[in-house]
């Protein structure tokens, strides 16, 4: 049971880290800034292959 909770905690921390880095609960992949302008409000830039949504 402890292993299950440890895995659950790791998944929660990783998802929060992705949320914090990208500003959204989902990591939105992009190739150009134009991809992000269609997927995120506020015309964000594409950094390291992911949209910098706010």
Curated annotation (Swiss-Prot):
InterPro entries from the UniProt entry: Scorpion_toxin-like_sf
Annotated keywords: Disulfide bond, Ion channel impairing toxin, Neurotoxin, Potassium channel impairing toxin, Secreted, Signal, Toxin
Signal peptide boundaries: 1-23
UniProt GO MF annotations: potassium channel regulator activity; toxin activity
Record's comment on post-translational modification: Probably has three disulfide bridges.
The organism's place on the tree of life at top rank: Eukaryota
Location within or outside the cell: Secreted
Keyword Signal: yes
Summary of the tissues where the protein is detected: Expressed by the venom gland.
GO cellular component: extracellular region
Domain topic, free-text comment: Has the structural arrangement of an alpha-helix connected to antiparallel beta-sheets by disulfide bonds (CS-alpha/beta).
Function (record text): Potential blocker of potassium channels.
Name of the protein in its database record: Potassium channel toxin alpha-KTx 14.1
């Amino acid at each position: 049971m402890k292993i299950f909770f440890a895995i659950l905690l790791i998944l929660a921390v990783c998802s929060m880290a992705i949320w914090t880095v990208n500003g959204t609960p989902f990591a939105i992949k992009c190739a150009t800034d134009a991809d992000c302008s269609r997927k995120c409000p506020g015309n964000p830039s594409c950094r390291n292959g992911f949209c910098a949504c706010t």
